[in-house]
Regions:
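Extracellular beta-strand scaffolds
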Residues: 183, 212-213
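Residues within well-ordered beta-strands of beta-sheet-rich folds
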Residues: 37, 207-209
Length: 213
């Protein structure tokens, strides 16, 4: 929660410490009323390697690649969420529910990858590669299919740690095969060939998603 609450659009904007917290309390209470176990996250990071003084990166970046106004990126990942990061933590403590600091988890991921490699996680599309967006896209907020899988895996690991009752339901795979590009490989044979020699005596688990191979 938090990305869209930051928008100044009156239909989506909420105030951290006020209406944003109230919404989180409502979500927790309604979930509990249905017998569910609520887990609150804070926002994942934006891929923002630009100084906070540059307002251009505080919005969803969907500029055409190569635009002359594109700011110069550095090597330090900067926060864009501010007080919105603390609301889920505060409400979780107040109501006694599990909290996952997805901001820190994704910050460590994106900062560790750096400004170049981290583009692989987000909707960075080269011009003339996708018919729907021939001009390409440089979106530093929304994850692509691969990035979503990477972050989802980290989220599941964190949930299992914070809510031990769910840990037994988590399934771990060494490789994932998927036709839509959401896995590590497109074919089963590629995944088999990727198993290193030193794992020959160790079980390697490969998840094969639905499809014809």
């Amino acid at each position: 929660f938090g990305h869209n609450d930051e928008k100044k659009d009156s239909t989506r904007y909420t105030v951290p410490g006020g209406s944003f917290d109230d919404n989180l309390r409502r979500f927790v209470n309604e979930t509990r009323a249905k017998g569910g176990i609520p887990v609150l996250f804070n926002s994942i990071v934006r891929r923002n390697f630009i100084s906070p003084d540059d307002k251009d990166m505080k919005i969803d970046a969907r500029k055409e690649p190569g635009a002359a106004t594109k700011p110069v990126e550095g090597n330090v990942l900067y926060d864009t969420h501010g007080a919105y990061l603390e609301s889920p933590r505060r409400v979780a403590k107040e109501l006694g529910v599990a909290f996952v600091d997805m901001n820190k988890i994704t910050h460590d991921l994106v900062q560790g990858m750096g400004p170049v490699e981290s583009k692989k996680l987000f909707m960075w599309v080269q011009p003339q590669t996708v018919p729907a967006i021939p001009q390409g896209r440089e979106d530093n907020t929304h994850l692509n299919v691969y990035g979503a899988r990477v972050v989802a895996k980290l989220a599941v690991q964190a949930i299992a740690k914070e809510v031990p009752a769910l840990a037994g339901y988590v399934r771990y795979y060494d490789y994932v095969v998927a036709k839509d590009g959401s896995g590590d490989f497109f074919t089963v044979q590629e995944a088999i060939d990727a198993v290193p020699d030193f794992r020959k005596g160790v079980r390697t688990t490969i998840l094969i998603r639905k499809g014809v191979y």
